[in-house]
Amino acid sequence: MSSNNQNTNNTSIELISENGPISLNLMMEEGVKALTRILSNQLNDTPGTQPMHFIIKKNDKDNKAIDINGDDEEVVELGNESNYHMSDGVQNEAEIILNDQLNDILKNHESQLRLDGEEAEIIFDYETQGTVDGSDSIGEKITQMIESVLPNGLGPNTTGKLQAVLNGKELNITEEIHKSDRIEEEEHIEGGLTTAEGNFEVEFETEPLPEDHKHTEENIDGHENYNDCCPHHHNNQDNRRRAPKYKNYNYHDYEYTVQHPKTEPNFSALINQKKPVCLFCEYYMVFGEPPKNMIKWYNMHYGYNHLPQRNDRHHRNR
């Protein structure tokens, strides 16, 4: 195995028999279980060890002694049951094999494993990756990821700036805007405001002001008939420009006329109304009485403490 292959982490097991296939269950339960236990110590103690090649031979061949330093395959003697071969890469005799464990396995299951042929081999091929320092490598990866999203990188003072990034202090990523673009944007906003303001004035001035702010009492089935727009939508000449913002600001000043005897709701009064009226007046037109609870709620949220007051109250019905 070449040295550059030692940086992977792959493991493979292969069983080969000249007398036919070996049972997969037996391989998993016996062979792999034993070999995994045997090799676990070597994997933990010596990372980067070369693959091992185990060959189980027929017992009529000569037994050989262990040759740790030899260049050829090294043989481990397992009594009279079989010969156990191991390829180069073994570090010491203690890491080669646990003789008693593997010998018991082979003795108990020799007939089932069909080890009567000339040769059967088990290849336990593994490659280990030298474990790198986890904290440093992970930290380096995180630093690279953060640096890739920052406009100017982390700069020379990487540690301090990285800590600031993790604390949310260096995430003020701004987009560069040319001066000409900024001036053009400001002119566009100002032009839009001017246009909107002009439209507002024209629209408002075209709305006629009523001559009288009082309700006209033309009794239709006991309900009020509003031929003009609701007086609450209008103010005096000086304050009319603020009226749309506080369209209903003087509702709390208005006193509706004395209510008529209760009758059935008359929704046709809204059909005959040519101009829009406020919600309170709609209720008053339909039901013939002011919405006391609605006015109370409105005064609580938008009453004297929240909205400007009228100086003249000539619109109050007396």
Swiss-Prot record:
Principal location listed in the UniProt entry: cytoplasm
BP-aspect Gene Ontology terms: cell division; mitotic spindle assembly checkpoint signaling
Keywords per UniProt: Cell cycle, Cell division, Cytoplasm, Cytoskeleton, Mitosis
Keyword Cell division attached: yes
Function: Part of a checkpoint which monitors spindle integrity and prevents premature exit from mitosis.
Name assigned to this protein: Protein IBD2
Organism: Candida glabrata (strain ATCC 2001 / BCRC 20586 / JCM 3761 / NBRC 0622 / NRRL Y-65 / CBS 138) (Yeast)
UniProt keyword Cell division present: yes
UniProt-annotated location(s): Cytoplasm, Cytoskeleton, Spindle pole
InterPro entries: IBD2 (IPR026231)
Family statement: Belongs to the IBD2 family.
GO cellular component labels: cytoplasm; spindle pole
Domain of life per record: Eukaryota
Record field: transmembrane: none
